[in-house]
């Protein structure tokens, strides 16, 4: 008789949950809210005029404990300027197969060029597609931004960019 009672007691839990509202989430159809400080995918930011904030210093790559970041810096020229200052990140790659989402790269960046977004949907069925290049990482151009390369704002110095004194490009400059 005790063995029969054990089986009935086990089914009592099952029958009790049978009439409750399910706890499952409708994830693909209805994505849930994300915490504001969630560390999702990385983003390379731009200045308000469209120039890139990355100066190609490679500090993010050195800070990464998983060795997931590859940066190749290059010099800006008078004809091709991608960022204020003398250097820019010509090649920038993040290997999301290796990234552990710790955010140490964000802390190491001196120009706040690299931040993490709330986007968490990066799954893919191809390993090669999880190595994101600069084309996927750069923030999209907003209104008032010009796609680099283009010269710095007239009369502006590197310090003006770093101190936030540069605004969007006006129509007369375009």
From Swiss-Prot:
GO molecular function: 4 iron, 4 sulfur cluster binding; iron ion binding; NADH:ubiquinone reductase (non-electrogenic) activity; quinone binding
GO CC, any one term: plasma membrane
UniProt topology in membrane: Peripheral membrane protein
Catalytic activity entry: a quinone + NADH + 5 H(+)(in) = a quinol + NAD(+) + 4 H(+)(out)
Entry keyword 4Fe-4S: yes
GO biological process: aerobic respiration
Cofactor note: Binds 2 [4Fe-4S] clusters per subunit.
Matching Pfam families: Fer4_7
Binding of [4Fe-4S] cluster 1, residues: 54, 57, 60, 109
Stretches assigned to the 4Fe-4S ferredoxin-type domain: 44-74, 90-119
Ligand binding ([4Fe-4S] cluster 2): 64, 99, 102, 105
Keyword annotations of the record: 4Fe-4S, Cell membrane, Iron, Iron-sulfur, Membrane, Metal-binding, NAD, Quinone, Repeat, Translocase
Location(s), subcellular: Cell membrane
Major location (coarse): membrane
Cofactors that this protein relies on: [4Fe-4S] cluster
EC number: 7.1.1.-
Task performed by this protein: NDH-1 shuttles electrons from NADH, via FMN and iron-sulfur (Fe-S) centers, to quinones in the respiratory chain. The immediate electron acceptor for the enzyme in this species is believed to be menaquinone. Couples the redox reaction to proton translocation (for every two electrons transferred, four hydrogen ions are translocated across the cytoplasmic membrane), and thus conserves the redox energy in a proton gradient.
Family in the record: Belongs to the complex I 23 kDa subunit family.
Assembly and binders: NDH-1 is composed of 14 different subunits. Subunits NuoA, H, J, K, L, M, N constitute the membrane sector of the complex.
HAMAP family: NDH1_NuoI (MF_01351)
Name used for this protein in its record: NADH-quinone oxidoreductase subunit I
Organism whose genome encodes this protein: Mycobacterium sp. (strain JLS)
Gene coding for it: nuoI
């Amino acid at each position: 008789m005790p063995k029969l009672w054990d089986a009935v007691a086990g089914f009592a839990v099952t029958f009790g949950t049978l009439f409750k509202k399910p706890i499952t989430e409708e994830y693909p159809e209805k994505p849930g809210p994300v915490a504001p400080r969630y560390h999702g995918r990385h983003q390379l930011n731009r200045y308000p005029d469209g120039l890139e904030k990355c100066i190609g210093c490679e500090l993010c790559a050195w800070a990464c404990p998983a060795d997931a970041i590859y940066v190749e810096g290059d010099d800006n020229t008078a004809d091709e300027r991608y960022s204020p200052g003398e250097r820019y990140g010509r090649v920038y790659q993040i290997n999301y197969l290796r990234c552990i989402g710790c955010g140490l790269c964000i802390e190491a960046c001196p120009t706040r060029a690299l931040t993490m977004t709330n986007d968490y949907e990066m799954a893919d069925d191809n390993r090669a597609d999880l190595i994101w290049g600069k084309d996927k990482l750069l923030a999209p151009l907003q209104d008032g931004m010009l796609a680099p390369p283009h010269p710095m704002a007239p009369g502006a110095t590197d310090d003006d960019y770093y101190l936030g004194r540069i605004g969007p490009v006006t129509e007369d400059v375009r």
